[in-house]
From Swiss-Prot:
Record membrane topology: Single-pass membrane protein
Listed Pfam families: PetN
Name of the protein this chain belongs to: Cytochrome b6-f complex subunit 8
Keywords for this protein: Electron transport, Membrane, Organellar chromatophore, Photosynthesis, Plastid, Thylakoid, Transmembrane, Transmembrane helix, Transport
GO process terms (BP): cytochrome complex assembly; photosynthesis
Superkingdom of the source species: Eukaryota
Range of residues in the leader sequence: none
Quaternary structure note: The 4 large subunits of the cytochrome b6-f complex are cytochrome b6, subunit IV (17 kDa polypeptide, PetD), cytochrome f and the Rieske protein, while the 4 small subunits are PetG, PetL, PetM and PetN. The complex functions as a dimer.
Cellular compartment(s): Plastid, Organellar chromatophore thylakoid membrane
GO MF, one example: electron transporter, transferring electrons within cytochrome b6/f complex of photosystem II activity
Keyword Thylakoid assigned: yes
Cited function: Component of the cytochrome b6-f complex, which mediates electron transfer between photosystem II (PSII) and photosystem I (PSI), cyclic electron flow around PSI, and state transitions.
NCBIfam families named among the record's database cross-references: PRK02529.1
Length: 33
C-alpha cells in the first residue's frame, strides 16, 4: 500500500513537472513560472 502510494505521488509529481515545462514553453502568457 505504501509503495503503491509512493509510486502514485512520484508519477503525479513527474507529470506535473512535465506539464510545467510544456506550459512554460508555450508562451501563451497565462502562466509564467
Amino acid at each position: 500500500m505504501l509503495i503503491t502510494l509512493g509510486w502514485a505521488s512520484l508519477a503525479a509529481l513527474f507529470s506535473f513537472s512535465i506539464a510545467m515545462v510544456v506550459w512554460g514553453r508555450n508562451g501563451d502568457g497565462s502562466m509564467n513560472f
